[in-house]
Amino acid sequence: MSLDIKKYPTLVLADNPMELRQLPKESLVALCDELRQFLLDSVSRSSGHFASGLGTVELTVALHYVYNTPFDRLIWDVGHQAYPHKILTGRRDRIATIRQRNGLHPFPWRGESEYDQLSVGHSSTSISAGLGMAVAAEHEGLGRRTVCVIGDGAITAGMAFEAMNHAGDIKSDLLVVLNDNEMSISENVGALNNHLAQILSGKLYSTLREGGKKVLSGIPPIKELVKRTEEHIKGMVVPGTLFEELGFNYIGPVDGHDVQGLVQTLKNMRAKKGPQLLHIMTKKGRGYAPAEKDPISWHAVPKFDPHMGTLPKSGDGCPTYSAIFGDWLCATAADDDKLMAITPAMREGSGMVAFSRQYPRQYFDVAIAEQHAVTFAAGLAIGGYHPVVAIYSTFLQRAYDQVIHDVAIQNLPVLFAIDRGGVVGADGQTHQGAFDLSYLRCIPNMVIMTPSDENECRLMLHTGYHYQAGPSTVRYPRGNSTGAPLTDLHELPLGKGVVHRQGAGVAILNFGTLLPQAEHAAQAINATLVDMRFVKPLDDTLISELAASHQALVTVEENAIMGGAGSGVNEYVMQQRLQVPVLNIGLPDHFIPQGSQEEIRADLGLDGAGIQRQIKDWLA
């Protein structure tokens, strides 16, 4: 897919920041309009993250116009909003390949461009990394500046405040831009704050303020009076007390869609010393009415017709595993008012919208605070309630110590519903759920279940919920379920697998939703196929029986081979001195790049043909 760049006469002159900085300031409004239209035209044809980028067009232009990137370092938190940044940094012609196999990375990525200073994907990392870069720049002594752009959601995470607390303490030169898109800007207050921001960020104000401090330093009562008066005046229009207390000079809020005003304010702030925070107000989805009205639905989009203003409806296929979880959650809460469901800012993605509306007193969105979510669940369990933590595999990594220290050591009955286990797809290395079986399997007291279809998923959620002897996890993938018929809920016997197909010679031990692919291979080579169901406790008895009646065992899982379910089988076989070779099939020892789930599985030999080929090659 290619767009006619002649339709964007100003944008064509700004293929990179050096060209951008040659444009007259008066042309920046037209550039922003064209950049926003280019983003709409491109993403509507290729799919990708959408609403966030529409909201940061003016900020992106202003930052690259004022700062000498890539010498000056610009860091984007999470990266959903960085499409305009990629377009303006030499990647305009490849933007249609974003999130696709062998295409542009979905987030800023160090290996892709010198303008991408930090590889990102998870939230709230920008200020910590930016502070490290700022300290390095001070030691370097070349006058390099550092800017971090972070959203109002990401800044709520503890890591962001830890970094700001440190920055305020060591007084390094660092600009944090808080992109606040939670509310619209009042014209009157916005205009007043824009004017105030230029005054507060200007040289005259800084000189007077510092000079006044020196003059009044020997007169504490007067100095304190002036400080309080200043804070009172700023406080009427500037909600920055918290950031000031952390040691930042706070400027804002300002209109994040006034590119001329942003350029002037950023020019003023670039020369300032110490930690600075610029608070800008933006509209997520800016310039495209449907996305402005419903930015959540338009956050990441498939291909769509921009003239229609609607997203294509998903087919009438099987429900997603997230929806299966959400339905189970609502059904269980209907019979048990002690159920407490927790999510770290992933209500929609985890399938919890209906539950949050039907059972608001039993629903807790703790924001981007994975560590708190897990320990909060521990407290609920101690209090006699039944917590369910719904969390993506890749984000549970951020709360690993809490899982061990606050839940497992105390053997608390917390159920972890782990979504996006295994190959996730288009979001690439930072979002694949490759490691959860490995990092959970080594934790004492933890029960780990891997359903092969939606019915098993429901049964395992039910089993884990009613398991009161300690913590449990149910791990399921992104995407649609298989269409398996749903049975009445009942508890499964712990640590027991099911023989799915009887064959000879080779026994395939499958963990999770690769069962159809494993079945393809089993039929092709007449192998026995087992749905193991439990990673921990393992079905030791069944493994011993299979080892005695087969010449070889093969484990299949959509997790890292190192430390995963197959490693558990290996450990048991060696411990028992069973005389049978074992082949482990799973994710290799490297980070998995983006692509569709089907493409990635085929590349890694995890489709039916690939599993069959790996077994045949091993047996040869």
UniProtKB/Swiss-Prot annotation:
CDD domains: TPP_DXS (cd02007), TPP_PYR_DXS_TK_like (cd07033). Mg(2+) binds at residues 152, 181. Belongs to the transketolase family. DXPS subfamily. This is 1-deoxy-D-xylulose-5-phosphate synthase. It catalyses: D-glyceraldehyde 3-phosphate + pyruvate + H(+) = 1-deoxy-D-xylulose 5-phosphate + CO2. Thiamine diphosphate binds at residues 80, 121-123, 153-154, 181, 288, 370. It is an enzyme of class 2 (transferase). One of its GO terms (cellular component) is cytosol. Pathway: Metabolic intermediate biosynthesis; 1-deoxy-D-xylulose 5-phosphate biosynthesis; 1-deoxy-D-xylulose 5-phosphate from D-glyceraldehyde 3-phosphate and pyruvate: step 1/1. It comes from the Bacteria. Binds 1 Mg(2+) ion per subunit. GO terms for molecular function: 1-deoxy-D-xylulose-5-phosphate synthase activity; magnesium ion binding; thiamine pyrophosphate binding. PANTHER family: 1-D-DEOXYXYLULOSE 5-PHOSPHATE SYNTHASE-RELATED (PTHR43322), 1-DEOXY-D-XYLULOSE-5-PHOSPHATE SYNTHASE, CHLOROPLASTIC (PTHR43322:SF5). The keyword Metal-binding applies. Catalyzes the acyloin condensation reaction between C atoms 2 and 3 of pyruvate and glyceraldehyde 3-phosphate to yield 1-deoxy-D-xylulose-5-phosphate (DXP). Its cofactor is Mg(2+); thiamine diphosphate. The gene is dxs. GO terms for biological process: 1-deoxy-D-xylulose 5-phosphate biosynthetic process; isopentenyl diphosphate biosynthetic process, methylerythritol 4-phosphate pathway; terpenoid biosynthetic process; thiamine biosynthetic process.
